[in-house]
Structure formats: C-alpha cells, structure tokens
C-alpha cells in the first residue's frame, strides 16, 4: 500500500496509494464504491462517476479539511492529486523571487468551476486568498455553496461573474487590484464533437457503457471553445498585456506539448519579459503549465515588497 506515485511534487499529500480504510472512515459513503481488482486488491470503481465523486469528497475532507463538497451532475470532477501539483509548483514559482513561498499571496483562478478545487487546496496548503472568475451561473452557485458550507472559506475565497464570455481578465481584475498570480485550466477541445469524442474515449478506457446514465461530465465552457486550447491561451496572453503591472505571474495549464510553440511565439510578440515552463507528472499522465511575466527581476521584487 505504500508504492509512491511517480512524478508528484514533493509537498503533494498524495505521494502514496490511497489509504482507503482511512478515507472511508472520513467519508463512509465511499465504502459502497469499493471493488476488488483482478489482482485481488481493493480499489475504487473508477468507471463509476459517483464513485469518483465520493473519492474526491473523501480526499478533500481527509487532507484539506473541506467537510462539505459536492458538484451538480454534468460538471467536471477533477483529479485532486493533479490539481494539488499545480498549486505546489505555483508556490515554488512565487517563492523564487524572494527565496520563500509567500504566505499572503493573492491568486486569480480563471474559471473556478463548480468544484472550486484550486482555491480549496491553495487556502489549506498556503493560506492564500483567491478570487475565482466564472461564466456559468450554475458553476458559480455550486462553488459559492461549497464556500459557504465550510467555515472560514468565505474570508479567503471570493467569486466574480464574468459577464462577457469572450473576455478573460477584463471585467474581473479591477482597477488598483494586484495579484501574485493567475491560474487556469483552459478548455482544450475546439468543438463539441471533439469534446464528446474525448469523453467517449475516457469511458471506453474505463470500461464504462456508452449508455450509462452518468458520465464524467464537463459543461461546454469547461471542455471546448472556438479554436481550442491554443486560441483560448492566445486570447489570455493578449489580454494579459493590459494587466501587466497588476499581476506578477500569469499562468495556465497546457494539455499538449505540441501546443507550446505557437504560445511561445505569442508571448514573444506580447513582450513577455520572462517565460517559464513547469513540467508535472501524475502516474503515467504528463502535464505542464506555462508562466509569464512582464516584469524584470527588480520590478518583481519591488512588486512583492509594495504589495506586502
């Protein structure tokens, strides 16, 4: 039960295989979703979306003190270890300027989602304060319900509705507001058909019947946008220029390595002073995020000093 997962960040709490007994003690409903693998080991029925949701609920309660968490049907149920990795690598990036991870960082989560996952982890692990933007009323209501149901979160997490679905930072970052970083898990498909095909592949890989009533979810704004991930991030890069003095680091996940070259070109054209790529791995899954800033070393130090 102690096999280490390759590639996770050293501070990630999910280095080892899940202690299912402990998780079931924290969240008893998980017990009904346990199965035996062909090798005879106890596991979670990952082909069942309700089981995945129960596992997430248990992980968030056990490791992050989130006692009440739920999402409506049809929304993305995020893998907690991978989301935690982004937060920990972002903490390392923020710590590079001064040599220590900031305890009072303010973070903007672009597309906070119904699950509110990044703020939940970031508040618990580092005491950061989050603003979460969202275009979907249903997702925003879900995230707000999670915040209100857990003591102390309303002081650390605030949500803002993005009224213009074509905008990313505009309308969310207010005048005289400053952020240490933005983060984002962008939509990666370029059409609804591509998103459906991706969901079908995931179901087949997990042995789930196509006609199952439940699937792994994902609303339009979570899964696809015109032009796909590259177009979305290029839009983000273009908009980031307007807020170049209000944000220290802009960051976003990039799902595929082949998407990086056009993004690097866009960053050069936008005048980014420094661009960083952070590679991550969760088991067999490789992922990465890119970060860019319009501030030089001295400017970044002054920004941090002034903001503190």
UniProtKB/Swiss-Prot annotation:
Catalytic activity annotation: adenosine(1618) in 23S rRNA + S-adenosyl-L-methionine = N(6)-methyladenosine(1618) in 23S rRNA + S-adenosyl-L-homocysteine + H(+)
Domain of life: Bacteria
Pfam (any one): Methyltransf_10
Keywords of the record: Cytoplasm, Methyltransferase, rRNA processing, S-adenosyl-L-methionine, Transferase
Tagged with keyword Methyltransferase: yes
E.C. designation(s): 2.1.1.181
Keyword Cytoplasm part of the UniProt annotation: yes
Cellular location(s): Cytoplasm
GO cellular component terms listed in the entry, alphabetical order: cytoplasm
GO biological process terms on file: rRNA base methylation
InterPro entries, A to Z: METTL16/RlmF, rRNA_lsu_MeTfrase_F, SAM-dependent_MTases_sf
GO molecular function: 23S rRNA (adenine(1618)-N(6))-methyltransferase activity
Function: Specifically methylates the adenine in position 1618 of 23S rRNA.
PANTHER family to which the protein is assigned, alphabetical: RNA N6-ADENOSINE-METHYLTRANSFERASE METTL16, SAM-DEPENDENT METHYLTRANSFERASE
Family according to the record: Belongs to the methyltransferase superfamily. METTL16/RlmF family.
Designated name of the protein: Ribosomal RNA large subunit methyltransferase F
């Amino acid at each position: 039960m102690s096999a280490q997962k390759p590639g996770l960040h050293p501070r990630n709490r999910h280095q080892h295989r899940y202690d299912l007994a402990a998780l079931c003690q924290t969240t008893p409903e998980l017990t009904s979703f346990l199965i035996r693998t062909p090798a005879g080991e106890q596991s979670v029925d990952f082909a069942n979306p309700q089981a995945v949701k129960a596992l997430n609920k248990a992980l968030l309660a056990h490791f992050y003190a989130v006692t009440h968490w739920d999402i409506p049907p049809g929304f993305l149920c995020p893998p907690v270890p991978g989301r935690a990795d982004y937060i920990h690598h972002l903490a390392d990036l923020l710590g590079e300027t001064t040599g220590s991870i900031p305890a009072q960082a303010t973070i903007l989560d672009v597309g906070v989602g119904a699950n509110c996952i990044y703020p939940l982890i970031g508040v618990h692990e580092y005491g950061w304060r989050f603003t979460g933007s969202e275009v979907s009323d249903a997702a925003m209501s879900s995230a707000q319900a999670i915040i209100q149901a857990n003591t102390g979160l309303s002081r650390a997490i605030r949500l803002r509705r993005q009224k213009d679905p074509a905008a990313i930072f505009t309308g969310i970052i207010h005048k005289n507001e400053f952020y240490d970083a933005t983060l984002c898990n962008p939509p990666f498909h370029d059409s609804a058909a591509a998103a459906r095909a991706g969901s079908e592949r995931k179901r087949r890989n997990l042995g789930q019947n196509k006609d199952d009533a439940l699937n792994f979810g994902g609303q339009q704004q979570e899964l696809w946008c015109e032009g796909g991930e590259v177009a979305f991030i290029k839009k983000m890069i273009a908009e980031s220029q307007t807020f170049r003095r209000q944000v220290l680091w802009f960051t976003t996940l990039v799902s595929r390595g082949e998407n990086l070259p056009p993004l690097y070109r866009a960053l050069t054209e936008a005048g980014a002073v420094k661009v960083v790529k952070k590679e991550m791995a969760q088991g067999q899954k490789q992922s990465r995020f890119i970060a860019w800033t319009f501030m030089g070393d001295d400017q970044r130090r002054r920004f941090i000093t002034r903001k503190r």
